């Protein structure tokens, strides 16, 4: 009996957010960009814990019942819970936006009504006509995958320019610079489509991060073109180097740093 040939094409598992290309694991764009230093992250995490302690002293006292170790572990989780909550809100916004673009009715939670109204204002003011919605992309040459939010025809209200752009919805504090490399990676991928149903990514002339807020929206144009994509490819290479250098944390010595030759008791 002959061995089964690898599955052709791109697949995505939402549960663990893993991509596979032609049967092999392939890193996602956001994972690749994670190799970049985020200098503000430690300050943000410390701020989350500090705000929690200052704003809810009764809850802090309750945590003391867990003992020192339990209390420390609970406080350490606060930034990541806030991140996960924000991620859930972002997913909800993406779902609403996709339905609005498809012309479907949306049943909106009351607290999110202002955000959805801001999204509608953006779609109207920029005269958005969707070309691709929530689309998976990949590159065999550079070995990466990802999921874009929107490619659409648009009209810039500030200049009147009409074109086809790639857009990314953002619901956090702002649009970060990494979004530019993210959008270029999606736009210059080799194909879009899952399970072997592969098509060229529509040509775009611009990239935009769309920050939707309850009181309005911001659209941030990003640098766009082959030279910016080349920068992403360099980051992809850096990600691969860092992965090899660090090795598998479960296997000491699997990276570039060998197993320590110990004398005495290790700390």
Specify the residue positions occupied by each region the protein language model found.
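Metal-dependent nuclease catalytic cores that hydrolyze phosphodiester bonds in DNA/RNA
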Residues: 1-145
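Glycine- and charge-rich intrinsically disordered segments
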Residues: 1-13, 18, 159-160, 248-267
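Nucleic-acid nuclease catalytic cores
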Residues: 109, 137-237, 242-245, 251-263
């Amino acid at each position: 009996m002959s061995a089964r040939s690898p599955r052709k094409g791109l697949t995505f598992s939402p549960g663990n957010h893993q991509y596979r290309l032609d049967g092999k694991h392939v890193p996602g764009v956001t994972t690749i960009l994670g190799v970049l230093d985020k200098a503000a992250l430690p300050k943000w995490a410390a701020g989350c814990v500090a705000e929690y302690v200052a704003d809810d002293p009764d809850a802090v006292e309750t945590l003391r019942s867990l003992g020192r170790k339990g209390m420390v572990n609970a406080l350490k989780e606060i930034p990541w819970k806030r991140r996960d909550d924000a991620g859930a809100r972002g997913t909800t916004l993406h779902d609403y936006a996709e339905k609005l673009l498809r012309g479907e009715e949306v049943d909106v939670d009351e607290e999110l009504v202002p955000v959805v109204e801001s999204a509608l204002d953006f779609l109207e003011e920029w005269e958005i006509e969707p070309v691709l919605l929530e689309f998976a992309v990949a590159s065999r040459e550079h070995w990466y995958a990802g999921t874009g939010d929107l490619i659409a025809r648009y009209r810039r209200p500030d200049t009147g320019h009409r074109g086809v752009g790639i857009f990314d919805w953002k619901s956090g504090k702002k649009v970060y610079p990494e979004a530019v490399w993210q959008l270029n990676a999606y736009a210059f991928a080799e194909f879009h489509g899952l399970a072997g149903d592969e098509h060229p990514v529509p040509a775009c002339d611009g990239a935009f991060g769309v920050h939707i807020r309850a009181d309005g929206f911001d659209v941030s144009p990003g640098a766009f073109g082959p030279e910016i994509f080349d920068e992403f490819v360099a980051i992809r290479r850096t990600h691969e180097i860092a992965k090899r250098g660090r090795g598998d944390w479960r296997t000491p010595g699997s990276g570039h740093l060998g197993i320590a030759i110990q004398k005495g008791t290790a700390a």
